[in-house]
Every structure is written in C-alpha cells, then in structure tokens.
C-alpha cells in the first residue's frame, strides 16, 4: 500500500493499492478521506462505495515489449524550460487555466522526459516518459487536432530511441486505450480510480 497522510496535488491519488487483496479499511487508514480524496485501486478489486466514494473511471494497464518501433512523421522535442513546460501544460489541459501540476523541477529529473511532439513547428501532442526499474512509464499523452495515431507512434518511437532495451507501461481507458492497442500495446488488467464526493 502506498498512501499520503496529507492531501496530494490535483490528479494524484491519496492512496494506491499495491496488492490485489488489500482491504478497504486498510486503504483508508491514515489518509484524509474528506471530499476530493482519491484512491487508485491497481487491481480494480475493491469497492469503496460504502465509504462514500464514487468510481471516477476504470482503465486498463497497458504494456508494450521493446520491439520494432512504429514509424512516425512527428518530431520529438524535449521540453527543457519552465516557459516551455507551461506551454506544454496548457496544451495538455486543452487551453487556459491549466492546473499547475507539472513543476519545473520535473525537468531536472534524469529519469523523466517531457516531450513535445511536433509536425514541423506545430505542436501535435505530448507525453511524459519516466524510466523506472526495468520499464518506461508512459503518461499524460495528449494529441492536438485529431493526431492521436501519429502521437502514439511518436511517443513509442521516442521512448525506444532513448531506452531501446526497455518495455513501455502505463494505463488508459476509452479511445486512448484503443489507440494504445493499435500501436502495439496489450491490455494486462483493469484498475479503478475512486473519488470521495
């Protein structure tokens, strides 16, 4: 079990189950369960409705072996400045008033890369890649103006260029899951995110 005794930033869970047999009362112990609290059940195995939580979404863990990378017409450009990160975050959020969840200190982390994916000079999308123990995490992928297929391909190609020996992992749902599967990922199993209303 991972948990934070203090409320986490927006979009980050207050607790994460690390074992399928976690018990809801154990998950809730030691966290602020007031409205806004969120829990990521990594196995979609628990039901928190009797504790005042509602399901926010169900997604699937995705995984891709480090095999042939897809061709992409997009150029991957590493975001390296605070101003560049603010512009990336605004595009990720879909416009103005983006929450400040990507801090400039992130750019100094050696195992984290924030990428702007460009068609010429135009931003087509972006992704965050983070290297962990034997795997590269892929998160916060977004596409601008219906470029999903090209953005997924570019994200996979960029990860393979940087860390060619490592597989990719993440989680997605809805149309994003379909794009991931079309790009060579496989769905491993469900996860569920709960929110206290």
Predicted regions and their residues:
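N-terminal charged segments
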Residues: 1-36, 42-45, 94-111
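Amphipathic alpha-helical "stalk" segments
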Residues: 13-14, 74, 92, 128-129
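A short, internal acetyl-CoA/4′-phosphopantetheine-binding micro-motif in the GNAT/acyltransferase core
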Residues: 16-22, 140-148
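Acyl-donor-binding surface of acyltransferase catalytic domains
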Residues: 18-83, 155-159, 168-197
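A short, well-structured alpha-helix characteristic of acyl/acetyltransferase catalytic modules
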Residues: 81-91
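A conserved beta-strand-loop-helix scaffold within acyl/acetyltransferase catalytic domains
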Residues: 97-143, 189
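Conserved acetyl-CoA pyrophosphate-binding loop and the N-cap/start of the following alpha-helix
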Residues: 146-158
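C-terminal active-site rim and adjoining tail of enzyme catalytic domains
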Residues: 164
